[in-house]
């Protein structure tokens, strides 16, 4: 079984072409931002050693930058629920955590307790 820890990032009221009312719930997964990759061909051992020393510092600086906190948002699931379905699901709000489980051809979504 695969389990995804999702975060609700938006909740919007929308209408379909027939006028039926739905609540659109967008869920993302936050993943760690990969560190910078050094692409170089160093025949020189001194250059290679310098890169091994510098790369951890560069990675730390990139993760400390204010634009994302070292994480990226990966869209995972969008739900279109009626008012009744949302009530049965449990009222979720922006910032709430939901668990998405995938197993044997089934996808289960539930708010984290």
Curated annotation (Swiss-Prot):
Annotated keywords: Cytoplasm, Cytoskeleton
Localization: Cytoplasm, Cytoskeleton
Cited InterPro entries: Arcadin_1
One of the record's GO cellular component terms: cytoskeleton
Pfam families recorded: Arcadin_1
Subunit and interaction comment: Forms probably oligomers. Interacts moderately with crenactin.
Remarks, miscellaneous: Belongs to a conserved five-gene operon within Thermoproteales denoted Arcade (actin-related cytoskeleton in Archaea involved in shape determination).
Functional note: Part of an actin-like archaeal cytoskeleton.
Protein name in the entry: Arcadin-1
């Amino acid at each position: 079984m695969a389990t995804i820890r999702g975060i609700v990032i938006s909740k919007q009221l929308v209408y379909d072409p027939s006028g039926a009312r739905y609540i659109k719930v967008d869920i993302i997964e936050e993943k760690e931002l990969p560190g910078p990759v050094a692409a170089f061909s160093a025949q020189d051992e001194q250059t290679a050693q310098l890169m091994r020393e510098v790369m951890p510092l560069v990675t730390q600086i990139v993760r400390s930058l204010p634009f994302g906190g070292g994480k990226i948002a990966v869209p995972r699931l969008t739900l279109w629920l009626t008012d009744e379905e949302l009530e049965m699901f449990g009222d979720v709000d922006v910032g709430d955590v939901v668990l998405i489980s995938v197993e044997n051809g089934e996808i289960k979504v539930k708010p984290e307790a």
